[in-house]
């Protein structure tokens, strides 16, 4: 029993010691490989066997996060994963000579790295490289994965704000090597969005890649670069709820000033209040928009609405002057009586009390002329005395004066009522016009969101 226990303990000890010894052998082989590779290696020179040979670099970009889009300064901040692959002619070995070791990971500062930078960089920091490891394979293939936070310039077009789409390009290329020395190409037709973290303000539609070969005035050789164009569309729900929808409701409320009775005294106050509310929203909009040549869509809508409210308030003041015109005003002109108080009043159903809609007021019969001596009423009885005749003539004169005064007062009152009715017709007419304008403008803007 004791002998069997002794053999079991010895077997377990060998089982634990054997992997450690093998691991140590693998570490020694990796150290030997590292010393052999970098004994006469320099990272200062382009790693090609022939100096006339072009070194090909493959560039792959993975979009991880949109950190910030500064519309006012037109700067886009992104978090990217950048992978670069190339072949180093001086870093090759036979895996069989090193125990089957076919890849090692070493600091990127030890090997030559392509000087690929972001051309449209927007900050003052000098271009630098992340100090991450590179994967080196036995055939000389080098793969360098590095995270990067980029700040690039992006021309923001706010003409369709808040339903706008932006195209922001990130151009990568070699800073010193021409196309005959270093050629950069994208891996795939677009950047990867597999690990992208969704942004609350922007929706990413894609990030296609495009290779260009340009020639600059300073040099005769071509310079290739790779441009990744980030396609963005703004999420407009917050702007619709906070800026657009209140303006739509206010614009629909403004024409209702024409429907208020003139005696309420609030017709002009409503228009001025609406104008002040639109001014406040206009200031809020101006704070979030960058200074640009093109006016955003919502800005045009605000200006059109404010113009409409201004005109409606001015027309309200003119109509109130017609409503409160004094008794000494002239009668309504014949053309206005026929056109506005006739056809337009019937079309808008503006009628006097007791008058059915669609029926115009019957023409007023002018009273028959009465002479001061022949007043209305039953004929006077026989009176032949001089005193009786004088009293009868005085009485008839007073009755005629009262009748003429009453007729003049009634004519002035009728003239005033005509002007008030004309004001109601114009109120109803402009209510329909301005409400239709506000509704059409609001629908045109809201259709952009669909």
UniProtKB/Swiss-Prot annotation:
Keywords: Calcium, Calcium channel, Calcium transport, Cell membrane, Disulfide bond, Glycoprotein, Ion channel, Ion transport, Ligand-gated ion channel, Membrane, Receptor, Signal, Synapse, Transmembrane, Transmembrane helix, Transport. NCBIfam families: LIC (TIGR00860). Expressed in inner-ear tissue, tonsil, immortalized B-cells, cultured T-cells and peripheral blood lymphocytes. Component of neuronal acetylcholine receptors (nAChRs) that function as pentameric, ligand-gated cation channels with high calcium permeability. nAChRs are excitatory neurotrasnmitter receptors formed by a collection of nAChR subunits. Each nAchR subunit confers differential attributes to channel properties, including activation, deactivation and desensitization kinetics, pH sensitivity, cation permeability, and binding to allosteric modulators. Forms heteropentamers with CHRNA9. One of its GO terms (biological process) is regulation of membrane potential. It comes from Homo sapiens (Human). Residues 355-380 are annotated as: Disordered. The chain crosses the membrane at residues 238-258, 268-288, 302-322, 429-449. Belongs to the ligand-gated ion channel (TC 1.A.9) family. Acetylcholine receptor (TC 1.A.9.1) subfamily. Alpha-10/CHRNA10 sub-subfamily. Forms homo- or heterooligomeric channels in conjunction with CHRNA10. The native outer hair cell receptor may be composed of CHRNA9:CHRNA10 heterooligomers. Found in the stoichiometric form (CHRNA9)2:(CHRNA10)3. It comes from the Eukaryota. Activated by a myriad of ligands such as acetylcholine. AChR activity is inhibited by the antagonists alpha-conotoxins RgIA and GeXXA, small disulfide-constrained peptides from cone snails. The heterooligomeric receptor composed of CHRNA9 and CHRNA10 has an atypical pharmacological profile, binding several non-nicotinic ligands including strychnine (a glycine receptor antagonist) and atropine (a muscarinic acetylcholine receptor antagonist). This is Neuronal acetylcholine receptor subunit alpha-10. It is a multi-pass membrane protein. It is found in: Synaptic cell membrane; Cell membrane. The gene is CHRNA10.
């Amino acid at each position: 029993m004791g002998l069997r226990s002794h053999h079991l303990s010895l077997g377990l000890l060998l089982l634990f010691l054997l992997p450690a010894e093998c691991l140590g052998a693998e570490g020694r082989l990796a150290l030997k490989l590292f010393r052999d590779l970098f004994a006469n290696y320099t990272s200062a020179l382009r790693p090609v066997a022939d100096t006339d040979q072009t070194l090909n670099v493959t560039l792959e970009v993975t979009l991880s996060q949109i950190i910030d889009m500064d519309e006012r300064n037109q700067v886009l901040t992104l978090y990217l994963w950048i992978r670069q692959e190339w072949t180093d002619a001086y870093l090759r070995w036979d895996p069989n000579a090193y125990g089957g070791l076919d890849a090692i990971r070493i600091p990127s500062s030890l090997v030559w790295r392509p000087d690929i930078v972001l051309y449209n960089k927007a900050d003052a920091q000098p271009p630098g490289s992340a100090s991450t490891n590179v994967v080196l394979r036995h055939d000389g293939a080098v793969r360098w994965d590095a995270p990067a936070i980029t700040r690039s310039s992006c021309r923001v077009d706010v003409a369709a704000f808040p339903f706008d789409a932006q195209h922001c390009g990130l151009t990568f290329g070699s800073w010193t090597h021409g196309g005959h020395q270093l050629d950069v190409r994208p891996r795939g037709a677009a950047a990867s969005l597999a690990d992208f973290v969704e942004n609350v303000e922007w929706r990413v539609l894609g990030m296609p890649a495009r290779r260009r070969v340009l020639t600059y005035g300073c040099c005769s050789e071509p310079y290739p670069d790779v441009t990744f164009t980030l396609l963005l569309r703004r999420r407009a729900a917050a702007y619709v709820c906070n800026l657009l929808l209140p303006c739509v409701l206010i614009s629909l409320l403004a024409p209702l000033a024409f429907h208020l009775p003139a005696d309420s005294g609030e017709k002009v106050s409503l228009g001025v209040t609406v104008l002040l509310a639109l001014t406040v929203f206009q200031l809020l909009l101006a704070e979030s928009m960058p200074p640009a040549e093109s006016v955003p869509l919502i800005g045009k809508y605000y200006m059109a609405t404010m113009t409409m409210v201004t005109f409606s308030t001015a027309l309200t003041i003119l109509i109130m002057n017609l409503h409160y015109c004094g008794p000494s005003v002239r009668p309504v002109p014949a053309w206005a009586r026929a056109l506005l108080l006739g056809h337009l009043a019937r079309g808008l159903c503006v009628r006097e009390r007791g008058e059915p809609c669609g029926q115009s007021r019957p023409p007023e019969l002018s009273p028959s002329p009465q002479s001061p001596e022949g007043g209305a009423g039953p004929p006077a009885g026989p009176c032949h005395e001089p005193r009786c005749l004088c009293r009868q003539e005085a009485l008839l004169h007073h009755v005629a004066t009262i009748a003429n005064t009453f007729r003049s007062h009634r004519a002035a009152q009728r003239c005033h009522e005509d002007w008030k009715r004309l004001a109601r017709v114009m109120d109803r007419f402009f209510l329909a016009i301005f409400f239709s304008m506000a509704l059409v403008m609001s629908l045109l803007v809201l259709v952009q969101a669909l």
